[in-house]
Every structure is written in C-alpha cells, then in structure tokens.
Swiss-Prot record:
Organism: Arabidopsis thaliana
BP terms from Gene Ontology: cell wall modification; pectin catabolic process
Keyword set includes Secreted: yes
Positions of the record's site feature: Transition state stabilizer: 196
Family: Belongs to the pectinesterase family.
EC assignment: 3.1.1.11
Protein name, UniProt field: Probable pectinesterase 50
Encoding gene (name): PME50
C-alpha cells in the first residue's frame, strides 16, 4: 500500500463524515445580542444539513416548488385557497407559496394530506390573512382564520387576524386567528391578532421567532410543545387578561410553552402570565422583559383546587417592573440554571432534525 499523508487522511475523514450542524443541546444565550449567531449556528439551511434531517423532509427540500399568489393578477393564483387546492394530496415536495402584499380575506385550512407547505410574505411589506369566524358560528377551535393540520409547515412575514369584535364578558366570543394542530411547524416574523383565544398552539412541536401575538384572555392556549423566541406578547383592553392556558393534562405529557427573550406588554393592568386551564400546565419564561402591566401575583390558579400542586410555572432571569418574584403566588418556580437549560434548547422541540430557516422571498 502506498503512503498517504495524515493531512490527506484528515481531509477524507472530514468530507466523508456526516455533517451535523444543528444540536439539541446548545442553549439560547442570555445575551440577546448573541441570538442571531446562535440561530445561524444551530438552524442552518437545507443545503448545509444533508444527512441530518428527517428523511422525508430532506427529500421534500430537494424538490422545492414555488407557487405565486397575487390578488391583482400576474401570478399563478389570485387567492390562497386556490393555491392550496392546487397542491396534490399526498404531497412530498416543499411547496413555497409566495404571497404578494395585500389583504386576503379568506378562511384557510391546510389539511393533513398536504405537508411541506410554506406561506411566505414579502419582508417589510404588509401581507395579511384575515377572517371573522367566531365560536358561535364554527365552534372555538374551528373559528380560526388559518388552521393547519399538515406536518412541516412554515410561515414567514405574515399577519394573521381574526377581525371578529372583542366579545362581551360571558359571551361565546372566542375567535381564533390561528390553530396549529400539526407537528414540526415554524413561524418567523409573523403577527397574530385577535381577542380571546388568538393562537391555538394545539398539538406538536413548534417554533416561533420574532413574532407578535395580541389578545385578551387565554390568547395562547393548547397542548403544543413550543419554543417562543424574541416574541412580543401584547394584551389589549382592561379587565381580566391572561396570556397562556397551557393544556397539559398529566405529568407524563411531553408538552409545554417556553418564552425566551420575549416581551410582555399591554394597554391595561394586571395581566396574568398563565392560568391552570388543565391540571398540569407547563410554562417557562426566561430572559423575558415584563413591563408594569403584569399582575404582581404572576399566575392564576383558576379556582381549581389542587392544581397549585401540579402546575409548573417557571421564571428565570426575567427583568422589568413586572418581573419581581416577591409577590408571586407560592407555586411559582424560581428555577435555576440547571433546571432552565432544557427549556432553552432545540431539544425541547426536537428541533435539530426538522427546524429550518425561512426561505428568501
């Protein structure tokens, strides 16, 4: 056998080995300025992730298709519903639906047989999907302007609204902007507007980055396992205001909400970070700015006896006038670095094998 230099061997080993460029163990840094680099390191594009993604996702990304939508014409379709219906059931390719700026007054459902869809708005422009469904008309979770049942969904640079009026106390006024009931979904620079039950983060692993979510009561609810990064949570109006109603129902369920480097704002006072809608909710806020609108007690037991012993409500290194723990309810978890770390990684949403950055417009 001929002589092969060690440098050549090293070269061959590097280029023959699988490239693992995302990790489920690297925590989001405490320094907000380091978020872009953390994201760039851990959420690289498909072209640099071959051999590390879910096989079905990798195959889909290798066969991308683009569909254009413009209400004014000059595109493949004039409505989003027409574009979605054009995608065959059993779809196996990444289909990027590029929406021209404008207001699309449509109620849209992406069914389970159409995975790998991306809804892409133009950065810096206003692309709005809006409808006015209510619980009285459709039932609570079916009232959403956008409902997604299909895996590997993405949305970027979109505003999703439910324009039904703010409900009166005691009325059946739930009106969702979005329901995500599918695994492995990501949202980038999206805005969700509604009042009660704005975002049904219903089921599956989800990632939200650079988003804005607005509502009144339980405006993020469901049983998703979700990581919210650099997202503003804004409560509107006065009276009882609650951000989360996380729906975990047993200690063995692997779901919950984590808010990292987020900001809690509002127009009223006394906002609760969450309430015990179900018996075992799990919600963590880390490195999050809490303005004076946050209720000093922080969390609401919802008059369910015994739930104070089964909830997991954690806060870690939050700041601002609403972040002080002295007056928090006794079941608030003032967690330490070791306890919070699992909530700060992509491992919380099993993200290293499916999470991809948004495509360019």
């Amino acid at each position: 056998m001929g002589y092969i230099s060690m440098s050549v061997v090293a070269f061959l080993v590097v280029f023959a080995s699988p490239v693992v460029l995302a990790t489920d163990t690297d925590p989001i840094p405490e320094n907000r300025a380091q978020i872009p680099q953390w994201f760039k390191t851990n959420v690289k594009p498909y072209s640099q992730r071959k051999g590390t993604l879910d096989p079905a996702l990798e195959a889909a990304e290798a066969a991308r298709q683009i569909i254009t939508v413009n209400q004014k014409g000059g595109a493949n379709f004039k409505t989003l519903n027409e574009a979605i219906k054009s995608i065959p059931t059993g779809n196996k390719n990444r289909v990027i639906i590029k929406l021209a700026p404008g207001v699309y007054n449509e109620k849209v459902t992406i069914d389970i047989a159409r995975p790998f869809i991306t809804l892409l708005g133009q950065p810096g422009a206003e692309t709005v999907l809006t409808y006015h469904g209510t619980a009285a008309q459709y039932g609570t979770v079916e009232s959403a302007t956008l409902i997604v049942w299909a895996e590997y969904f993405q949305a970027a640079h979109l505003t999703i609204k439910n324009t039904a009026p703010m409900p009166k106390p005691g009325s059946q006024g739930q009106a969702l902007a979005m329901r995500i009931n599918a695994d492995k979904a990501a949202f980038y620079s999206c805005r969700f507007h509604g009042f009660q039950d704005t975002l049904c983060d219903d089921k599956g692993n989800h990632f939200f980055k650079d988003c804005y979510i607005e509502g009144t009561y339980d405006f993020i609810f469901g049983r998703g396992a979700s990581l919210y990064l650099n997202t503003q949570l804004h409560a509107v109006g006065d009276g009882l205001r609650v951000i989360t109603a996380q729906g975990r129902q047993s200690a063995t369920e692997q779901n919950g909400y984590t808010f990292v480097h987020c900001k809690v704002t509002g127009t009223g006072t006394g906002i609760y970070l969450g309430r015990s809608w179900m018996s075992h909710p799990k919600v963590v806020y880390a490195f999050t700015e809490m303005t004076s609108v946050v209720n000093p007690s922080g969390w609401r037991e919802n008059l369910n006896r015994g739930y104070d012993k089964t909830v997991f409500y954690g806060e870690y290194k939050c700041f601002g006038p609403g972040s002080h723990l002295e007056k928090r309810v006794p079941y608030t978890q003032d967690i330490d670095k070791n306890e919070v770390t699992p909530f700060l990684t992509l491992g919380y949403i099993k993200g290293s094998t499916w999470l991809l950055p948004p495509p360019k417009y």
